[in-house]
């Protein structure tokens, strides 16, 4: 199975070269880097976390540098576009997508905190008119009501379900801890909550 690494912003350009070569050597299939600058902040935190995008030129330079550092043609660099998170337009996201693909990005990830998913749908459909082959990646955390079949009909190739397995495990962990505390032993917890 392919393994995709979350590379955050990719760091400084000179560090991204090292990251690409290291990931390739480890057998990782792809890295996703986001077009933000500054310290790492979750894109879904809302308006309290200010998202600052890199310039198109700066991010294209990072993509080109990463592609030039690759040893094999198999490794993919996927550009994550934060325009919709930052409150910018779909047109801005599309302009960035076109520039990033031109710079060598092997895929485009579009991100949004809009619960309807309408902006993602419009982006994907408009991007597909101009570019039929570049993979589109989405993370449908906030628009979780949309099915994979619908996403595929928009032109989406990959859906990432970010930390859903971990988040679903918390409920069982809390119940397990409560059982141990209530029973002053683990026997009941093992029988009920453990595999």
Where do the PLM segments sit?
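Alpha/beta enzyme core
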Residues: 1-161, 168-171
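Extended, intrinsically disordered, low-complexity segments
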Residues: 164-195
């Amino acid at each position: 199975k392919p393994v995709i690494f979350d590379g955050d912003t990719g760091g400084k350009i000179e560090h991204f070269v090292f990251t690409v070569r290291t990931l390739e050597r480890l057998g990782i299939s792809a890295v996703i880097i986001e077009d933000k600058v500054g310290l790492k902040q979750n894109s879904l935190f809302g308006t309290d976390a200010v998202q600052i995008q890199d310039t198109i030129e700066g991010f294209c330079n990072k993509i080109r540098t990463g592609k030039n550092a690759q040893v094999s043609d198999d490794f993919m660099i996927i550009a994550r576009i934060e325009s919709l998170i930052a409150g910018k337009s779909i047109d801005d996201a599309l302009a960035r997508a076109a520039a990033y693909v031109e710079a060598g990005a092997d895929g485009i990830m579009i991100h949004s905190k809009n619960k309807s998913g309408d902006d993602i749908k419009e982006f994907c459909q408009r991007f597909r008119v101009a570019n039929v082959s570049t993979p589109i990646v989405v993370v449908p955390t906030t628009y979780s009501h949309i099915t994979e079949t619908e996403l595929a009909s928009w032109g989406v190739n990959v859906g990432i379900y970010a930390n859903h397995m971990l988040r679903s495990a918390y409920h069982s962990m809390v119940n397990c801890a409560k059982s141990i505390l209530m029973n002053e032993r683990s026997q009941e917890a093992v029988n009920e909550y453990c595999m």
